[in-house]
Every structure is written in C-alpha cells, then in structure tokens.
C-alpha cells in the first residue's frame, strides 16, 4: 500500500522542479500533458492513483460501531460495485432520495457501518475515488426513470442557468456560452462536448489536492464569489445529476488529472 504521507516527499523531490516549473503553455491541454509526464517520470505513478489505492485499502477496512467495512456489503475490493458509478447520481429506495457518489457513501457509512460525524476529508474522498475507478472504461449512462430523478435533474438544470451573485454569473455562462475558451490558465470545459462528469473525482496539480465533483462545484461558486452549497446538500446532487446526464455516452476515466 502506498501511504498518503509519501506524496509530499515525492512531489517535493521531483528533481527540484515544482509542479509549476513548466512554463505557462499557450495550449493548457499541452501543459496538463507535460505535468502528467513529469510526475510519471519522477514518481512512476500519478498522485490520484495513489489516493485511489489508499481508498481501496480503506474500502476493505472495518470502521464504525457496526464493525463493518464497505466490502462487507459490496464484496472484496467492491466487486459488486463495478459499473455503479456509471449510473450515478440516481434514486435509492432505502434512502427514498436521489444521491450522488459522495452522499451515497456518507449514507452507507452512517446507516450500515455505524460511522458517526462523516467528514468530507481526504480519507473520504479517497474511498469515493476508488469506487469511481470501478467504472473506468465504461460509458456514463445516467437515467431519469424515477420521478425523483427527473425532479432533481430539473432542479440541477435551473441551478445551471441561474445567474447569481454580484458578478451575475451562472454555470451556463462559463461552460456553455464561453465553453472552450480560455480563462486565466485553463480552458473552460463544455459539459456535453467534454463529458465533464467522466473524469471526476480528479487530482488537481495546481493545488496538489484530490477533489470530487462536489469540491469542483464548490470551487466554481467560490470563483464567482457566491457562498457554495454544503457538501451532501441537494444543490450539489442536483448539479451533479445535471452534468452526469449531459455527459451520457462519455467514457469514464478516473481519477482525472486536471489543473
């Protein structure tokens, strides 16, 4: 098992070169490619994959008052969860609600494993990342068959187009109107064309952090100076569902490697 504390040592030892040593590229995609190649050359593995390995170990580790692990229900290494992420967010009968990856894991940990005060920390995100990798290579195929799924999708669509805050911005302004154009050091993704939901959770080399889609949503709200929705809240689930549905047909490849 590769320990998470090992990462800062490795990253700091990349030939004395920081993650920003590569000059700002005219093509942001080329910069991502070179950063990726640099890390693979010096470390032999990408940080996101290290976190996913850690997540697998935690997936099989008992925790909480019930003395159960995630694998107690979902099989060793999550063999019964293969392909599950490709259909998320979705409606869950035991919750009588629609849940994204993060919210579903939190619910399982609390209800079935007896874990109290679940936090959206690095350990939690490592588990989420590992679960997502179990759908790698599969097509995103979120459906809207249950009434609550359709309702949540519509809420997500409304949030997507809602102009908010002093900057009067919306998700759509950045990712529809100006999608494909460059802002600062990165290119704004287009939801449908870029199938954005297929590469989250992802490792962000710009801040050396592992992010789930919920973190990405919160980051966007912060950038437009609007108080972000809390983790595990319905706006998070609604926006995640909207993006996942619009990403249908895209091939899942997590953890992503992004700026």
Curated annotation (Swiss-Prot):
GO cellular component, one term: cytochrome complex
Cofactor: heme c
Name of the protein: L-cysteine S-thiosulfotransferase subunit SoxA
Binding site residues for heme c 1: 70, 73-74, 108
Xref: Pfam families: SoxA-TsdA_cyt-c
Signal peptide range: 1-23
Cytochrome c domain residues: 50-135
């Amino acid at each position: 098992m590769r320990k998470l504390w090992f990462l800062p040592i490795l990253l700091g030892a990349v030939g004395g070169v920081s993650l920003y040593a590569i000059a700002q590229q005219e093509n942001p995609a080329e910069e991502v490619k070179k950063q990726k190649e640099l890390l693979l050359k010096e470390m032999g593995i990408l940080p996101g994959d290290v976190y996913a390995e850690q997540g697998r170990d935690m997936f099989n580790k008992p925790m909480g008052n019930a003395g159960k692990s995630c694998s107690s229900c979902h099989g060793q290494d999550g063999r019964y969860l293969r392909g599950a992420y490709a259909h998320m967010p979705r409606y869950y009968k035991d919750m009588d609600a629609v849940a994204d990856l993060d919210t579903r894991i939190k619910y399982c940990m609390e209800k079935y494993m007896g874990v109290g005060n679940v936090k959206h920390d690095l350990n939690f995100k490592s588990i989420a990342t590992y679960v997502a990798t179990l759908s790698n290579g599969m097509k995103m195929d979120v459906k809207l068959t249950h009434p609550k799924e359709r309702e949540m999708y519509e809420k997500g669509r409304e949030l997507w187009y809602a102009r908010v805050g002093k900057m009067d911005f919306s998700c759509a302004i950045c990712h529809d109107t100006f999608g494909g154009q460059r802002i600062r050091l990165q290119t704004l993704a287009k939801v449908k064309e870029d199938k954005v939901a297929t590469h989250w959770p992802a490792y962000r080399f710009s801040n050396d952090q592992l992010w789930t889609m919920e973190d990405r949503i919160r980051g966007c709200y912060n950038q437009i100076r609007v108080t972000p929705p809390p983790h595990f809240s319905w706006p998070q689930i609604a926006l995640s569902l909207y993006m996942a549905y619009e990403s249908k047909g895209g091939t899942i490849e997590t953890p992503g490697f992004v700026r």
